[in-house]
């Protein structure tokens, strides 16, 4: 059983000098509510982008009883790996950037086939959204749209 689902959505931009929306977006802040925060990283240029380049850093917080967290996106998966996404440009849907969700202890969610799971009773967990593979990225705008939930104790 999944509980306390929240969603965070932000936009990354690529222009000649890729402008990334540097924002901190808390979704909720009450003690028993799930919080998901996504902060987009520094500016980068359209063109060659190296594998592993961090595009955004995310945090999930839940102070209630739980056994872990799940973070996922409804964006198109790239291949068979649940943590890899293929984002389409907003200005031109033929423009793509392939990204992956990663972080210490996070594992691909092979049961649901989307996103990643972290088994932990800790109140906080962090994750990163990084470029998946060396790519030539055109100037465009992409949306990062992630959802998160805390896993109920019986989900372990």
Set out the residue ranges of the language-model regions.
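A conserved short alpha-helix in the GNAT/GCN5 acetyltransferase fold that borders
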Residues: 16, 20, 147
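N-terminal small/polar-rich segments of proteins
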Residues: 28-91, 124-137, 141-143, 147-156
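C-terminal segment of classical bacterial N-terminal signal peptides
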Residues: 19-27
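Generic hydrophobic alpha-helical membrane-segment signal
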Residues: 14, 116-118, 128-129
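Mid-chain, structured segments of secreted extracytoplasmic proteins
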Residues: 74-120
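A generic short-segment signal for beta-strand/edge and adjacent turn/coil regions
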Residues: 26-29, 37-41, 68, 95-100, ...
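Bacterial N-terminal signal peptides that target proteins for export
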Residues: 2-15
């Amino acid at each position: 059983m999944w509980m306390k689902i929240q969603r965070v959505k932000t936009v990354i931009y690529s222009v000649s000098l890729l402008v990334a929306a540097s924002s901190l977006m808390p979704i909720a802040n009450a003690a028993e509510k799930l919080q998901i925060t996504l902060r987009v990283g520094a500016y980068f240029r359209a063109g060659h982008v190296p594998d592993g380049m961090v595009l955004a850093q995310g945090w999930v917080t839940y102070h209630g009883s739980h056994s872990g967290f799940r973070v996922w996106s409804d964006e198109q998966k790239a291949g068979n790996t649940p943590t890899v996404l293929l984002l389409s440009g907003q200005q031109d849907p033929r423009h793509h950037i392939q990204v992956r969700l990663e972080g210490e202890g996070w594992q691909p969610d092979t049961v649901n086939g989307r996103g990643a799971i972290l088994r932990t009773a800790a109140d906080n967990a962090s994750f990163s959204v990084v470029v998946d593979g060396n790519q030539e990225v055109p100037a465009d705008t992409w949306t990062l749209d992630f959802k998160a939930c805390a896993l109920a104790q019986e989900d372990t």
